[in-house]
Amino acid sequence: MKRILVVMSICAALAFGVSAAMAADGAALYKSCVGCHGADGSKQAMGVGHAVKGQKADELFKKLKGYADGSYGGEKKAVMTNLVKRYSDEEMKAMADYMSKL
C-alpha cells in the first residue's frame, strides 16, 4: 500500500510539473500580434476597430473566440479569423490576459 502511494505521488508531481511547463505564454504568443496591434497594444489594427490596450481579459477572450468561430468582427475579420483559429482556448486566454495588462 505504501509503495502505491509513493508511485501515485510521483505521478501526480510529474503531471503537475508538465502541465505548468506547458502553460501557454501570453507574452510569447502576443509577439505574432505586434505587427498590427503594436508592442504596447495601442495601435489600431488595419486602421479599424479598437486598440487592445485597456480592454479587460474576459472581453478580449470573447472577441478572440468570436474571431475563431467567425461570429465576431467587421469586414476585415478574415485576417483575424485565419490567425486566431489555430490557437487553443488556453492560448487565447493567455493572450487575452497578457493584452489586458498592456
Swiss-Prot record:
Q: Where in the cell is it found?
A: Periplasm
User: What Gene3D superfamilies does the database record attribute to this sequence?
Assistant: Cytochrome c-like domain
An example Gene Ontology cellular component term from the record?
periplasmic space
Provide the binding site for heme c: 33, 36-37, 80
Q: Provide the alphabetized UniProt keywords.
A: Electron transport, Heme, Iron, Metal-binding, Periplasm, Signal, Transport
Task: Name the Pfam families on file.
Answer: Cytochrom_C
The record describes its post-translational modification as: Binds 1 heme c group covalently per subunit.
Q: Does the keyword Nucleotide-binding apply?
A: no
By its UniProt entry, which InterPro entries does this protein fall under? Cyt_c-like_dom, Cyt_c-like_dom_sf, Cyt_C_IC
Q: What would be an example GO MF term here? A: heme binding
Protein name per its UniProtKB record: Cytochrome c-553
Q: What species does this protein belong to?
A: Nitratidesulfovibrio vulgaris (strain DSM 19637 / Miyazaki F) (Desulfovibrio vulgaris)
Organismal lineage = Bacteria, Pseudomonadati, Thermodesulfobacteriota, Desulfovibrionia, Desulfovibrionales
